[in-house]
Regions:
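Boundary/entry segment of secreted carbohydrate-active catalytic domains
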Residues: 25-91, 96
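Substrate-binding cleft of secreted/luminal carbohydrate-active enzymes
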Residues: 219-224, 231-369
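An active-site-proximal structural segment forming one wall of the substrate-binding cleft
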Residues: 110-128, 145-172, 196-208
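Aromatic-lined substrate-binding rim segments of carbohydrate-active enzymes
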Residues: 77-136, 213
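C-terminal motif of bacterial Sec signal peptides marking the signal peptidase cleavage site
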Residues: 17-20
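Aromatic-lined carbohydrate-recognition surfaces of secreted/lumenal glycan-active proteins
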Residues: 170-181, 202, 209-227
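Active-site groove signature of glycoside hydrolases
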Residues: 130-140, 159-192
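Hydrophobic faces of well-ordered beta-strands that scaffold small-molecule active sites
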Residues: 49-55, 93-95, 129-133, 171, ...
């Protein structure tokens, strides 16, 4: 009781001091950004969240995996993409380190120097890595080589101190290593066919990952291989590499209403969650491997899904403005799709008090691309 009385007296004196001393007291009223405020229609450069790039580095060959002749060094593709997407306020880079040349071997000092140069460039650009290690660049049995379980264990043990030294530039580590693009399918040695092998690899990836950094997994099924009471389970989040909204054979069984979808909804609020749309060729029905027709991906429903599953980052290079485009892709349509306060309130999605108006009170139109850009990992 004495403590309560003392607190009330101090509070009263403090209030009296501020109300009696007119000089030096400033009152500020804060509000949301109006559409016609300076930079009111531009994206915020939010650290560790928002849109991300994707860069794949062949660690042994020291070049960009998908166009080594055009980008024969370690960082030129990263620099080009950073400039190309600068207007989209990108602070993250999904960083693929392909260890193909280290299959059957130990990682060398030169391998670590190569990865270190890439990390240093990220630092200088003010960006962080959504980090994934992989070995295989082909699927459907086309890979020419791939790691064994022993290769992966050896490399994770070598990588552990290196990642600890560079944790300042790592936002999250994705559980790659297995199969095509590190997506846990189509591996050369069939590693994904054994639950014991997948569990062992996931545990070693968790040990490799610096303390304070989450691990993201492709589908909840793989996370569920672990004991739910284990520390490893408690630090694992998700990355969805095939966001198409409607059900598709390649969606990993994660379309809305499935147990996997609902697990992500439940477990994602306190974790970074990453994702991407398929490439534009899928939407344009130009992917010869696609087992069924593609489509333009709905922007409003994508925003709703990102909200429900608490996404932190989304690839801005998929289905948007890829080089040498001859078509208009999904995200370009998003820029033409208005988003309304009614839609947001109906779906219990956040909206700032000034987002849809100008300073004079008139209504400002916003599109779903801008809404996702401005809220991803921050308010959704």
């Amino acid at each position: 009781m004495k403590n309560i009385a003392t607190f009330m007296l101090v509070s009263a004196l403090t209030l009296g001091f501020f109300t009696s001393c007119d000089s030096g007291v400033q009152h500020r009223t804060f509000r949301g950004i109006y559409a016609d405020d300076p930079a009111g229609m531009e994206g915020l450069y939010n650290p560790e969240r928002g849109f991300r790039l994707e860069v794949a580095l062949d660690v042994t060959e020291k070049n960009y995996v998908w166009a080594p002749e055009e980008y024969p060094d370690i960082t030129s593709y990263l620099e080009e993409q950073s400039e190309f997407y600068a207007s989209d306020s990108v602070s993250l880079v999904q960083t693929y380190f392909y260890l193909t040349g280290a299959v059957g071997k130990e990682l060398t000092g030169e391998d670590f120097r190569t990865m270190g140069i890439f990390f240093d460039k990220l630092r200088s650009l003010g960006k962080k890595a959504v980090l994934r290690f992989a070995y295989e660049t082909q699927f459907l049995g086309r890979a020419a080589t791939g790691p064994t379980l022993e290769d992966i264990i050896r490399h994770t043990e070598q990588l552990k101190p290196f990642l600890e030294e560079n944790k300042d530039v790592i936002q999250v580590v994705q559980a790659g290593m297995i199969g095509a693009w590190g997506e846990w399918h189509s591996s050369f040695h069939g590693l994904e066919k054994s639950d014991d092998t997948k569990r062992t690899i996931l545990q070693h990836i968790c040990r490799m990952t610096p303390e304070g950094r989450a691990v993201q997994i492709r589908v909840p099924e793989y996370k569920n291989l672990l004991d739910t009471a284990s520390n490893d389970y408690k630090r694992i989040s998700f990355h969805d590499d095939f966001i198409v909204i409607k059900k598709h054979q390649w969606d990993g069984g994660m379309s809305e209403g499935t147990p996997a979808y609902e697990q992500i909804v439940r477990e994602s609020p306190c974790f970074p969650v990453d994702g991407e749309l398929p490439w534009e060729t899928w939407s344009m029905n130009e992917d010869p491997d696609n087992p069924e027709a593609g489509w333009i991906i709905d922007g409003l429903q994508t925003a709703r899904r990102l909200f429900l599953q608490h996404f932190t980052s989304l690839s801005v290079i998929h289905n948007y403005k890829e080089k040498n485009t001859k078509d208009k892709y999904s995200m370009m349509y998003w820029k033409e799709t208005p988003v309304s306060t009614e839609f947001l309130r109906e779906n219990k999605m956040p909206v700032s008090d000034g987002y849809f108006i100008r300073k004079d009170g008139s209504v400002a139109e916003r599109n779903v691309f801008d809404y996702i850009r401005d809220h991803l990992g921050y308010r959704i």
